[in-house]
């Protein structure tokens, strides 16, 4: 009898262990991203997500989103954040900072409570949409409600949604303060206060708003700050509003290891022609092209379209619904090139971007660092090319000195191994894509690759009506003056047939 009972107990234990190991096999895990990664994300302690002892439902969302192992910033942050301690974390762009604060935030949410339990602040509307989607995706098995609120949208819609339970509120500071001041967003029992891109949120334009928002939170709140750059203003905020924060600094160097940086000296009137040459010579999966003003964004997008390349543009003066559409379509691979202002330098994660071009060279090292960080995401390879005129040479030297890096002159031929992947169709698209859209995107990408690699491997771009997307509401007074700068020199025509050296 005793032997039979022992045998039964033994079998039961084995059955439970079996189910413990089988739950992973039943998950709908995406195809593994086989691209090589740099030490920015591979230099870990060897921890697994299971080592954090988080809820199984949360781990299910993590693995179904394509996560395999925690990155260095996640290894350092998650265990400390789970204890409720304040955190000041600094890590490179594209190394997994968002998941580093989203995972512990989700773990500490009580879905049975109807109160708002976490506030995540970001500086831009696009980043708010992206962060809220990460929260929804990783927490999809937890029964948690996530709401995103930003300026440029109707306030009444937000008021109606806040009548229901909202566990995590993601938004931009101005809109959240508006809702809190009106008593619509109740933050009195919200113990978690997160700031992503904290250096931007603590700039003079945002700091008063941030401090007002903190007054709506309980005194025993947890404050977490994340960014790639921390100016002196962050220290004063830390001393004033944080309690013995745990400081994490993984910035042994400022630039990402996987990004190759070049510059090309060109006259202002030659820039469009040089860009045309780059388009014809580079093997671009997706590219982001940065300009220093709203007017130049629109003018350059128009020029690129006239050259025959598909192009979207985005800047802060566009209607919010237009910005959202451009951002959504570009992330989903509808268009190959995006021209934008510094609106999209913060936190935007588009895995398919392998080339960043600074059509206008930035004025400071911080902006430069965030711009080039749009390629080479999560330890992958990327290419950053800077078009430099005579006036930019001092900024080039200054940025090299501040970042401790050397930007090389562009060679006649760029090695494709530095930024091109063997199978770009396997690059993960946004984790929110429904299967039908993902399949459609992959089929379009495959068709494009077939066309682009025809003609002896010469990489050509798709044409298409309506590719010049998103007419903004920017000021037009100086458009004619800016447009003159883009004109080609006499006797020189634009177009793919014209080739010129880029250095």
From Swiss-Prot:
PROSITE patterns associated with the record: DEAD_ATP_HELICASE, HELICASE_ATP_BIND_1, HELICASE_CTER, Q_MOTIF
Cellular localisation: Cytoplasm, P-body
EC code: 3.6.4.13
Domain Helicase ATP-binding: 78-248
Alphabetically ordered keywords of this record: ATP-binding, Cytoplasm, Helicase, Hydrolase, mRNA processing, mRNA transport, Nucleotide-binding, RNA-binding, Translation regulation, Transport
GO CC terms in record: P-body
Biological process terms in GO annotation: mRNA processing; mRNA transport; regulation of translation
Stated family: Belongs to the DEAD box helicase family. DDX6/DHH1 subfamily.
Domain of life: Eukaryota
Chief place where the protein resides: cytoplasm
Native species: Aspergillus clavatus (strain ATCC 1007 / CBS 513.65 / DSM 816 / NCTC 3887 / NRRL 1 / QM 1276 / 107)
List of residues binding ATP: 91-98
Domain Helicase C-terminal per the UniProt entry, residue ranges: 258-418
Protein name per the record: ATP-dependent RNA helicase dhh1
Span list, region Disordered: 1-38, 425-503
Reactions the enzyme catalyzes: ATP + H2O = ADP + phosphate + H(+)
Motif (Q motif): 47-75
Bias-annotated ranges (Polar residues): 7-18, 434-445, 480-497
Domain comment in the entry: The Q motif is unique to and characteristic of the DEAD box family of RNA helicases and controls ATP binding and hydrolysis.
A single MF term (Gene Ontology): RNA binding
Keyword ATP-binding attached: yes
Motif annotated as DEAD box, chain positions: 196-199
InterPro entries: DEAD/DEAH_box_helicase_dom, Helicase_ATP-bd, Helicase_C-like, P-loop_NTPase, RNA-helicase_DEAD-box_CS, RNA_helicase_DEAD_Q_motif
